[in-house]
Amino acid sequence: YPDNVVKEFIHLAAKNGVDVFRIFDSLNGLDNMRLSIDTVRECNKVAEAALCYTGDILDPRRDKYDLKYYVDMAKELAAAGANIIAIKDMAGLLKPEASYRLVSALKDAVDLPIHLHTHEGSGNAIYTYARAVDAGVDIVDTAMSAMSCGTSQPSGSSLYYALSGHPRQPRVDVDAMNELSRYWETVRPYYKAADQTELFPNPEVYVHEMPGGQYTNLKQQATALGLIERWEEVKDMYHRVSMMFGDLIKVTPSSKIVGDMALFMVQNDLSEEDIYAKGDVLDFPASVVEFFEGRIGVPYQGFPQKLQQIVLKGRKPLEGRPGDTLPPVNFEEIKAKLAELEAPITEEAVSSYCLYPKVFTDWVKRVHDFGDVSVLDTPTFFFGMKIGEEIKVEIEQGKMLVIKLVHIGEANADGIRTVSFEFNGLPREIDIKDRNVKATKKKKKKA
């Protein structure tokens, strides 16, 4: 994003109550992080600068990202103004003994709190946290038990009990945590259709190295492309692509780039050898081309030059920091676009449009069509009301609507049903097009 968009977002987030900003770059590029660190400090907020973990510091064969690499980066982040150093282990690759060595080394290298974030995909995250606690880690990320494990974080309650008898056992109200977990235990089943998290440990993550937040998304993409029967091939190709790209650090957006290339290769039955042999006639995914152009920065130790030349097909890569090549956004022009959409013209709306123009536009259109459906309870939103059911909807503080569904009529020739309901005790009717019913009445063509 252009620098003025990044700065505006941080200022607005701080204004709206965000106190701690976790700042990371998908390629661990410090130059891409400086602007955010400086802006957060200008806002008198906490800049938590993250080093993204990949590889295995215990494996001498994976020496690109060794212990010295992470220690040196932590020192650079501290010098750049970070208040906290985060270890962002987005795929859950940090093994227990590696966490002890890494946290110990960082505690010796910088006089800042160390915050560890990992995922439970391998099943080893609790042990990883326990060893990090032994090494002096200051903060770890956990999840409520009902939302934990799989590609999520380990359970906070489980960690509490795992550290029983340890001098650094967290001083938390575990009964209150368990009560909150029971709430999420009730809510989670409503989202089952979108919940593709594996409910069992899968140490294969140490092989494919796919971030926890990407695993389910890529699986859905594979399903949409008709590749779910070849999911094992996709996972294998994901790792192959990562190594082709130079043993890449994989976190948004670099992880998506690797995923796009893996799907592209499996869908087209391409091997690594095919890429080098036929690359001049292949139409690579846009995200892959932009990556090799340097639009998200330059990987540690640079691009694999031969592959870069094949993908770019004679185009020149960018020079310098990507943000320096982007002109500032004209916020007044964005306000004019919001006016055309009949969207609220607020600082937050402008920033949202700058960050996600299509998503924001689709959301505005949906609100225009259906109103603010976020006020509905989850079962009603997903499944609708049953005949005789009554719900209460708070549309703003102190303003409650009581709605009761009374009757749904038969569909007419146009596929229209009359829905009868009570609105705050008063009878109402509305005609709704049933999209599951084919109209039997033929419409006359206009002249």
Region spans (language model):
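Alpha/beta enzyme core
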Residues: 1-116, 129-137
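Generic beta-strand/beta-sheet core signal
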Residues: 24, 50, 88, 115-119, ...
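Metal-coordinating catalytic core of metallo-dependent amide/deamination hydrolases
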Residues: 68-69, 73-76, 80-83, 180, ...
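Catalytic alpha/beta core domains of metabolic enzymes, predominantly
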Residues: 90-287
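Proline-centered turn/helix-capping motifs that create local helix->coil transitions or kinks
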Residues: 189-193, 427, 440
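Terminal or standalone catalytic/regulatory effector modules within metabolic enzymes
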Residues: 199-205, 209, 213-438
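Structured functional modules or segments
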Residues: 445-447
